[in-house]
A protein has these predicted regions:
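Terminal and linker regions of secretory-pathway proteins
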Residues: 1-281
Length: 281
């Protein structure tokens, strides 16, 4: 609820140039967010550093007219049937995906069903695997675990003093502002939430890779019949980061739900920071 419904309308408004739903729908969904209490909730708990106190449960989405996420989700798919909630800037046709997920454009072969991959992973060879598989044996009574922000995560931060939460801004399943509110409701190492606001300017730097010049040359000179390029990733300022009391929070404009899939350079940089490679990302 917190990472979806309470923050979905501000996210939709932010991405109007990518998700241009009609004015009538936008006016209706904005008015409903206000009447259901989501707007005031969002404005209060995304701007208070330190937080004013324990953050209450968001307004109930089961109240009439307050299930905003599902209404927005359906409206987007009518407009763009190839919409990907894990990476909101995708359009038709479906992108080819060797993993078969999260796009619906799965390729002719499933990477996880390759026998050499299964052997390398010590997985049973010949089993029909696919990414993020569900099924009756996976949480048959739903996942009963306590939300991490209400239980184990503060303890993990205190025990390690080296915890990173990264959030792609192109994720339309979980929203960065929802995760930030969750952080603001956690107490760790003696204080609740971040005591100062995270950076509002890009400050997460990824070093440049020589392969970028090679790819730029191919593009600028329209060189034909070049082999596929796999060994590169974006560089420069790739997001924002903020650290307090052993917790680092990073927001990443070019990533969706899966950070290593969309911006692998940032993923490696975060791992380097995690293992002690410098005092900043």
């Amino acid at each position: 609820l917190l990472t979806e419904i309470a923050v979905v309308v501000p996210a939709l408004q932010y991405f109007r140039n990518v998700i241009p739903l009609n004015e009538t729908f936008m006016a209706d969904i904005t008015a409903r967010a206000q009447s259901c209490g989501y707007t005031d909730f969002f404005n209060k708990y995304t701007t208070s550093f330190p937080p004013p106190g324990p953050i209450p449960i968001p307004p109930d989405s089961l109240l009439p007219g307050c299930d905003l996420y599902d209404d927005i989700y359906n409206a987007i798919y009518y407009m763009n049937p190839c919409f990907n909630i894990y990476h909101l800037t995708e359009y038709c046709p479906y992108l080819y995906d060797e993993l078969g997920f999260p796009s619906l454009g799965g390729g002719p072969s499933n990477y996880f069903n390759r026998s050499d991959v299964q052997k390398a992973l010590h997985a049973p060879i010949g089993t029909d695997f696919y990414e993020c598989a569900g099924g009756p044996n996976l949480f048959p009574n739903t996942d009963q675990s306590i939300p991490s922000g209400l239980g184990p995560l503060p303890s993990v931060i205190e025990r390690t003093n080296n915890t990173i939460i990264g959030h792609g801004l192109l994720d339309f399943l979980l929203f960065a502002n929802g995760s930030l509110i969750t952080i603001q409701n956690m107490t760790w190492n003696g204080y609740q939430g971040f005591q100062s606001p995270p950076s509002s300017t890009m400050n997460l730097f990824v070093p440049y890779n020589p392969s970028l010049d090679y790819i730029l040359n191919i593009v600028n000179n329209a060189i034909p019949n070049t082999p596929p390029q796999h060994d590169t990733a974006g560089a420069g300022m790739q997001g924002t980061w903020h650290t307090e009391r052993g917790l680092t929070w990073a927001t990443l404009p070019l990533a969706g739900h899966e950070i290593p899939q969309y911006i692998p350079g940032v993923a490696y940089r975060m791992m380097e920071f995690f293992f002690g490679g410098g005092s900043r990302i």
